[in-house]
UniProtKB/Swiss-Prot annotation:
Task of the protein: May play a role in bone development.
Region (Disordered): 1-36
Ranges of biased composition (kind: Basic and acidic residues): 1-11
The protein's name in its UniProt record: Transmembrane protein 263
Length: 120
């Protein structure tokens, strides 16, 4: 038994099974069910997150996927699970379909866009 304990003590800290005591010192965990304002700086997206835009400010509920970029939620509908239409920014998918980015493509026709027929 004492030989096994001695082997554990000889291992470097990064090989130990136990996490360090100050693991969350620099990155505190956001509270579940809270809303984070997405307007520059840190934001979070939760599994099955729902986003909304109110007065030009995007809001995304929850936690678990942290980024540090300015983000705007995509106002276009998403054509398939896990596909986001975001131009020149950051996109993230967490559980459901959530697209965020620094610039959203405006007026993007998706799928069944209105096509002119011969009578027009």
């Amino acid at each position: 038994m004492s030989e096994t304990n001695q082997q554990r003590d000889d291992l470097p800290a990064y090989l130990n099974d136990e996490p360090p005591a100050d693991a969350n010192k620099d990155h505190p965990q956001p509270q579940p069910g809270m809303f984070s304002r997405v307007a520059g700086g840190l934001f979070s997206v939760t599994k099955g997150a729902v986003g909304a835009t109110v007065g030009g400010v995007a809001w995304v509920g929850g936690k678990s996927f942290d980024l540090t970029k300015t983000a705007v939620t995509s106002v276009a509908s998403v054509p398939a699970m896990g596909v986001g239409l975001v131009k020149g920014g950051v996109s993230a998918v967490a559980g459901g379909v959530t697209a965020v980015g620094s610039a959203v493509v405006s007026k993007v026709p998706i799928g069944g866009g209105k096509k002119k027929d011969k009578s027009d």
